[in-house]
Design a protein with these regions (language model features):
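Membrane-integrated ABC transporters
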Residues: 1-35, 47-72, 86-91, 95, ...
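An intracellular "coupling" helix at the cytosolic face of ABC transporter transmembrane type-1 domains
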Residues: 12-13, 115-116, 132-141, 145, ...
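Transmembrane helices of ABC transporter permease
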Residues: 13, 17-30, 143-197, 268-281
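Residue-level recognition of transmembrane alpha-helices
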Residues: 21-22, 70-73, 77, 151, ...
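Juxtamembrane helix-loop junctions of ABC transporter transmembrane domains
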Residues: 23-24, 31-47, 75-123, 127, ...
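Conserved catalytic Walker-motif region of ABC-type ATPase nucleotide-binding domains
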Residues: 110, 232, 320, 348-350
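Helix-loop-helix
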Residues: 161-175, 245, 249-318, 324
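ABC-type nucleotide-binding domain
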Residues: 332, 339-594
Length: 594
């Protein structure tokens, strides 16, 4: 059994079912101890020709054998089968439900963690929590409860029977048990540490494999298959060594328990045989005593298994606890209100921001205003802080008080859900789900019709590509959309955002993978369909944003200039230099192609 703040509540929640299983277990354990008494009757009947039943001496006949031994044995077996089926359903069924509840709780907590958490913790490690560690918790909860109570009840009942038959023999038999308990306690601590190391090693191996499968195209392009194989072999070898070490300890524990069992058998046969020789035991009583000891062999063996499972369960619970204890950095403050009837006005006031654990501010004294319905471009060199602005607007990170306003209201006074719901977002990494194209486009709108989906695809200029696929909109995309080209992936992502028709549309470098003619079509469609709605377009190419209402030019985390393209070109030397360089690059490429 394992205990912890995230597991204890389930013992109470499933208490009725566990108590029913415990009652069935107690019944099975009690009637199981009637079997050694039947052994005694058979042995004494064969040796003495008579048996004592309920204080009455009866001749050992076929009728007595059938009525007082065979029929009771049949009933005992039937009741044991029914009881064991019942407690298995109760204990193991509860364990499955506990794992399901805990998995849901983990997922619910995970979705509320900030983006920073996922930048620090690798996907492979997180996935191992939902697979290996949860499986261990499930096994430990079901088997652990069973083994604990079975070892306790059957062991105590059998020891009581043994004690009433001969105190001295029972005390001698308990000496190895005390030694085993002391050894097992120390080994449990070692096994907990080793299991944690095992799970960490498996997480590293899983994460490495996941990254390689995701980046297989890059690996092949750079002909690094053998190098990655060697790295995998190294991690796999480390994982193997840790597993072998753990297996050695578990095997040693099992051997020690077996040694203990055999030691007790020697004591019973030696001293018990002496008691028979002295006439204090008859042969039937010795067999009965051995039968009681055989009944507690399973609890004794269960002790080693319980120690191992508890060690594993405790280690896995510690890892899961780290996830559930991870603080929710970005959360609503008490008393926040919803952003109702959003218009799309955005204002930054002297905002300074650095990423958690960052060494310097990526945004410095940022101030600008976007009126509702404006189309605004945000440009700047790589690392200028363009994406950081989007992260703050979407409340991916905490925003300093009084520095960011939506429709004139501080975002910290608004619920995160309502602010995000007022936005449609196309990120740099155009993530698509392993689902149909239709479901990907309709991801943000639950009641989208096929006509709505097709209209959004047309505005993103991806409709013709989709209908060319064999299954059209029902085409199932591979993981992260690998079955479509980069440009198609971007346009499907744009269609998804356009379908939401949010007051604020944010496109973060979202047309970089399409040609200039396709880009022009998309931008024209945006202009026509987004009239009166705010659009933010982050781009590297000036041609993407030069026709927008105004452009915000960022340079080294500061707002260098704000205004229409012509105004910035005339008044801002840095902006003009960037425009001229891009035009020169375009002319050079055009000359080469010619």
């Amino acid at each position: 059994m394992i205990f912890g703040k995230y597991i204890n509540r389930y013992y109470l929640k499933h208490a009725p079912v566990l108590l029913l299983g415990l009652a069935a277990l107690l019944t099975v354990d009690y009637i199981q101890l009637l079997i050694p008494q039947l052994y005694r009757l058979v042995i004494n009947g064969v040796n003495l020709g008579q048996v004592v039943v309920n204080g009455e001496t009866l001749p050992f006949t076929k009728e007595v054998l059938l009525q007082h031994i065979c029929l009771p044995m049949i009933w005992i077996v039937v009741l044991m089968v029914i009881g064991r089926f019942l407690w298995r359903i109760c204990f193991f069924g509860s364990a499955v439900r506990v794992a399901a509840d805990l998995r849901e709780r983990m997922f619910d907590h995970s979705r509320r963690l900030s983006q920073q958490y996922y930048q620090v913790n690798k996907v492979g490690n997180l996935m191992s929590l939902y697979t290996n560690d949860l499986d261990t918790i499930q096994e430990c909860f079901g088997d652990g409860v069973l083994m604990f109570f079975d070892a306790l009840t059957l062991g105590l009942l059998a020891l009581y029977k043994m004690w009433t038959m001969d105190v001295r023999l029972t005390l001698l038999a308990l000496i190895p048990a005390l030694i085993m308990f002391a050894i097992g306690t120390q080994m449990s601590k070692v096994m907990t540490r080793r299991w944690e190391e095992r799970q960490e090693a498996f997480s590293g191996l899983s994460d490495f494999a996941q990254e390689n499968f995701s980046g297989i195209a890059v690996i092949k392009a750079f002909v690094k298959e053998y190098k990655e194989l060697q790295a995998f072999r190294k991690l796999n070898k480390e994982n193997e060594e840790i597993n072998v070490t753990y297996t050695k300890i578990a095997t040693l524990l099992e051997v020690l328990v077996t040694l203990f069992v055999e030691s007790v058998v020697c004591i019973i046969l030696g001293y018990g045989g002496y008691l028979v020789y002295q006439g204090r035991f008859n042969a039937g009583q010795l067999v009965e005593y051995i039968g009681y000891f055989e009944a507690i062999v399973w609890p004794i063996m269960a002790v080693s298994m319980l120690i191992e499972k508890t060690s594993r369960g405790r280690a896995s619970l510690n890892r899961i606890t780290e996830l559930l204890d991870a603080p929710i950095d970005v959360a609503d403050r008490p008393g926040v209100a919803d952003l109702t009837d959003p218009k799309g006005g955005i204002e930054f006031r002297h905002l300074n921001f650095r990423y958690p654990d960052g060494e310097y501010d990526v945004l410095r004294d940022i101030s600008f205003t976007i009126a509702p319905g404006e189309s605004v471009g945000i440009v700047g060199k790589t690392g200028a802080g363009k994406t950081a602005l989007v992260d703050l607007l979407l409340r991916t990170y905490n925003v300093p008080d009084g520095t960011l306003f939506v429709d004139g209201r501080d975002v910290n006074s608004l619920s995160i859900h309502s602010v995000r719901n007022a936005c449609a977002y196309v990120p740099q990494d155009n993530f698509l789900f392993s689902d149909t194209i239709a479901h990907n486009i309709a991801f943000g709108v639950d009641d989208a019709t096929p006509e709505d989906i097709e209209r959004a695809a047309s505005m993103a200029d991806v409709r013709d590509n989709i209908v060319d696929f064999k299954d059209g909109y029902e085409t199932v995309l591979g993981e992260r959309g690998v079955t479509v080209s980069g440009g198609q992936k971007q346009r499907i992502s744009i269609a998804r955002a356009l379908l939401k028709d949010a007051p604020i549309l944010i496109l973060d470098d979202s047309v970089s993978a399409v040609d200039t003619s396709t880009e022009k079509i998309i931008l024209d469609n945006l202009k026509n369909s987004r009239a009166g709605r705010t659009t933010l377009l982050i781009a590297h190419r000036i041609s993407t944003v030069e026709r927008l209402d105004k452009i915000i030019f960022l340079n080294e985390g500061r707002v260098e200039a704000v205004g229409p393209h012509d105004q910035l070109y005339a008044s801002c030397p840095e902006y003009r230099r960037m425009v001229d360089l891009q035009r020169l690059e375009d002319e050079t490429k055009g000359g080469e192609n010619a």
